[in-house]
Amino acid sequence: MKNLKQTTILFLSFLAITLQSCNSSNVDKADKYYKDDNVPEAIKHYELAIAEGDTTATNKLALLYTNEHQPEKAKEVYIKSFEKGNMEAAQYLANVSLRDEKYNDVIKYAKPLADKGNKEIVYALGSAYLKLTQYDDAIKYLKMDAGNVYVKDPLGQAYYDKKDYINAEKYWKSAVDDHQSGAINSYNKLLNLYKEQNRQKDYDAYNGRY
C-alpha cells in the first residue's frame, strides 16, 4: 500500500512536470512563430497551451489579436478565460465594456473584483453605475479610490447629479488643487459649477489654472 502511494505521488509529479513542459513548449513555439510573422501557427500553439491550462497563453493570444486589429477575437479569448475564473480577463473585459458603453457588462465583470478590494477596477465600475444613474452605487465604489485624480471626476459628477453640490465641488476642487495633471475634466466641471452658482470670485480664482 505504501509503495502504491509512493508510485502514485511520483506519477502525479511526473505528469505535472510533463504538462508544464508542454505548456511552456507551446508558448515558446507560439512566441517564435509570432516573432517570425507566422500568425496562424502562433495562434495554433497559443490555443494548444490554453487548452493545457496556461493562462499566460491567454493573455498573449488576446494581445496578438489586438495587435492584428481583431478586437472582437481578443474579447472572445478573454470571455472564455473569464468563464474559467481568470480575474485578469475580467479586468480587461470591464474596461472594454465601458469603452463600448455596455454598462451592465462592466458591472458583471468588475463588481466581483471591486468587492474583493481591487481598486484598479473601480473607475470602470463607478463610471458604469454613474451612466446607469445608480448614483449611490457609483459613489460607494468610486470612494474606494477617491485619491485618484481620474476617479475624482466621476465621483464629483455622481454627487452633482444627486444635487449634492458641496461634495461635487469638494472632489473636483481637490483634483485641481492636488494634482498637476489629469484633472482637466474636473477643472471644466468646477468652473461650470461656479458659473451656475454665480460665484464669480471663485470662478476667477480657478480660471486659467489648467
Predicted regions located by residue number:
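C-terminal motif of bacterial Sec signal peptides marking the signal peptidase cleavage site
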Residues: T18-S21
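Register position in tetratricopeptide repeats
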Residues: K35-D36, L48, N67-E68, R99-D100, ...
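Short helix-capping/linker turns of helical repeat alpha-solenoids
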Residues: E52-D54, K84-N86, G117-N118, G147-V149, ...
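Terminal, low-structured helical/coil segments at or just beyond the last alpha-helical repeat
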Residues: D177, S181-Y210
